[in-house]
Amino acid sequence: MFDLELLGRPEGEGDRLFIWGRIRLGQFQDEFQVPLYDWAPGDYAAQWLEAAERLIHGAPVVVFLTHMMHPTAGYHMGWPAWREGDKVLVQERLFLPEQLGGPIDLEHPETHLGPRQEISDEGLRISQWSVTVRDVAAFVERRRRSSVPA
């Protein structure tokens, strides 16, 4: 199972406006706040769908952005997904400006990734989940059939 969705209605106001999001990777699921400062819910849904489509059509890596303020913000968050054959390996990632070398590339945020790592610089194992390309294709199909955004 692979799924990314937005839950409920926006909460907060101004630059603290957000909506809850959820990712499902096999049996794992995580809920997170999705800021609505610069991007609207439809922007996230469109980015997720576009990234998933690129992945199932052969892209070796994509990033599903889940925390986007503006390209020059203090940080961004997303879920990089590396395709290895029929398997997709997914990690959560914090993108910091000093690691990006400039504003984040919204069209192709994966350009900021580098190779997939399983051990952090501190020597700790990086959490990683495995789904299949078929799981990601099913996500695309569900989103294409649904009139409800992510």
Residue ranges, per PLM feature:
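N-terminal low-complexity, intrinsically disordered segments
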Residues: M1-Y75, R83
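Short, surface-exposed, polar/charged, turn-prone segments marking secondary-structure boundaries
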Residues: E50-A52, V90-R93, E118-I119
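Intrinsically disordered, flexible peripheral segments
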Residues: P80-G85, V90-Q91, P97-E98
